[in-house]
Curated annotation (Swiss-Prot):
SUPFAM superfamilies: ALDH-like. Catalyzes the NADPH-dependent reduction of L-glutamate 5-phosphate into L-glutamate 5-semialdehyde and phosphate. The product spontaneously undergoes cyclization to form 1-pyrroline-5-carboxylate. It is an enzyme of class 1 (oxidoreductase). Its main location: cytoplasm. Gene3D superfamilies: Aldehyde Dehydrogenase, Chain A, domain 1, Aldehyde Dehydrogenase, Chain A, domain 2. GO terms for biological process: L-proline biosynthetic process. PANTHER family: DELTA-1-PYRROLINE-5-CARBOXYLATE SYNTHASE, GLUTAMATE SEMIALDEHYDE DEHYDROGENASE. Its EC number is 1.2.1.41. This is Gamma-glutamyl phosphate reductase. Belongs to the gamma-glutamyl phosphate reductase family.
Length: 421
């Protein structure tokens, strides 16, 4: 079987499986998800062992620490993933919900109802937890899913999908509701992007190269996002003591994820007092800095190492303990910098001036905009959406963390009495 035949079979099987999924009741889907959670718990030793093999191979192949952190699925993280399944079970099922209805003058009773998309293709890199997160959200919303993870996570993904597929069969459903492309051949990615006869939406979760590939080659609607060049602006009216804690959380808590902080913009009135305090605190936590000329002069006087920032560094999603620092004259300058370099993911302002905060929120056009909060909150779980499929930085069909509703569409239902036009 060549690649085209293989992908066609995947697509046909997924489409066929999606029909039965779309008719499941909320209770049936909850029972399925509980079965998956129980089976994952029972198989945790095998799953962790498979992940340890992936991690060992990654280290042997010289992958970066950031990539290895994304790849890791130890027992603690796995149990967190399983706990998220319980959270999703508790969420309201959007499928079947009536969005609106009305009686038309012609006698038709017209309504709009949420329905599954059908088949979703997801392409992602070194994050095995995504395998479970996406499968669970897809099944909760009655969608079949075709998964293509990175070759670095192949052993982990095989172990996870084996368990999920066994749960499908146990619940009387086709195992093809969840399928994994387990061939690392990159040509299969391009083929999947053109499988528009069977796949209704593609979600790429990865870096700029993957996003660009999908945007250029897909004949299927694609949800772009996941690249987070995130900013925090420290305003003239900010509480500087509290600001340090927020910036630490946004940068240090988990620097390898897309909602981690990349650049801090500091109002000029605070530059000399605040930047040294912030840099000393963060450097003690292992953070390295790129700064504008003013920042370099301030930190140079304090004997704190800082590299020269430029457009390239401001355009970088660091995914590591590296931080850009820039002094700005005012709110307008901060907003202009964000408009120039942001990926449209998450931005925050730290200020006690409500009018400035409102101006910032209105002026910044990103998926999530915060006042006096860390960018780390841009997450499906934190937003109460359950585990997320992705964080979309586009405006159609979804924006920000994609929860259950983002995996549905709607159809028009019209009741008549043998009505003619």
């Amino acid at each position: 079987m060549n690649n085209d035949e293989y992908l066609t079979a995947l697509g046909q099987n997924a489409k066929q499986a999606s029909y039965a999924l779309a008719t499941l009741s909320g209770q049936q889907k909850s029972a399925l998800l509980r079965c998956i959670a129980n089976k994952l718990t029972a198989a945790k030793d095998d799953i962790v062992a498979a992940n340890q093999q992936d991690v060992a191979d990654a280290k042997a192949n010289g992958l970066s620490d950031a990539m290895i952190d994304r790849l890791l699925l130890d027992e603690t993280r796995l149990m967190g993933v399983i706990s998220d399944i319980d959270n999703v079970i508790g969420l309201t099922d959007p499928v079947g919900c009536e969005i609106d209805s009305r009686l038309l003058d012609n006698g038709l009773r017209l309504s709009r109802r949420r329905v599954p998309l059908g088949v979703i293709g997801v392409i992602y890199e070194a994050r095995p937890n995504v395998t479970v997160d996406i499968a669970v959200l897809a099944l909760k919303t009655g969608n079949a899913v075709i998964l293509r993870g990175g070759k670095e996570t192949l052993s982990s993904n095989k172990a996870l999908c084996k368990v999920i597929r066994s749960a499908m069969v146990e619940q009387g459903l086709s195992e093809d509701c969840v399928q994994l492309i387990d061939n690392p051949d990159r040509a299969l990615v391009s083929g999947l992007l053109k499988l528009d006869k069977y796949v209704d939406m593609i979600v790429p979760r990865g870096g700029q190269n993957l996003q660009r590939l999908c945007a250029e080659q897909a004949t299927i609607p694609v949800i772009l996002g996941g690249i987070g060049i995130c900013h925090i602006y420290v305003d003239a009216a900010a509480n500087l003591e509290k600001a340090v804690a927020v910036i630490e959380n946004a940068k240090v808590q988990r620097p390898t994820v897309c909602n981690a902080l990349d650049t801090v913009l500091v109002h000029a009135s605070h530059a000399k007092a605040f930047i040294p305090v912030l840099a000393k605190h963060l450097s003690g936590l292992g953070v390295k800095f790129y700064g504008c000329e003013q920042t370099q002069a301030i930190l140079g006087a304090e004997k704190i190492e800082v590299s020269a920032a430029d457009d390239e560094s401001y355009s970088t999603e660091w995914l590591s303990l590296t931080l850009g620092l820039k002094v700005v004259a005012d709110l307008e300058s901060a907003v202009e910098h964000i408009r120039t370099f942001s990926s449209g993911h998450s931005e925050s302002i730290l200020t006690d001036n409500i009018h400035t905060a409102s101006e910032f929120m209105n002026a910044v056009d990103s998926a999530a905009v915060y006042v006096n909060a860390s960018t780390r909150f841009t997450d499906g779980g934190e937003f109460g959406l359950g585990a997320e499929v992705a964080v979309s930085t586009q405006k159609l069909h979804a924006r920000g963390p994609m929860g259950l509703e983002a995996l549905t569409t709607y159809k028009w239902l019209a009741w008549g009495d043998y009505t003619v036009r």
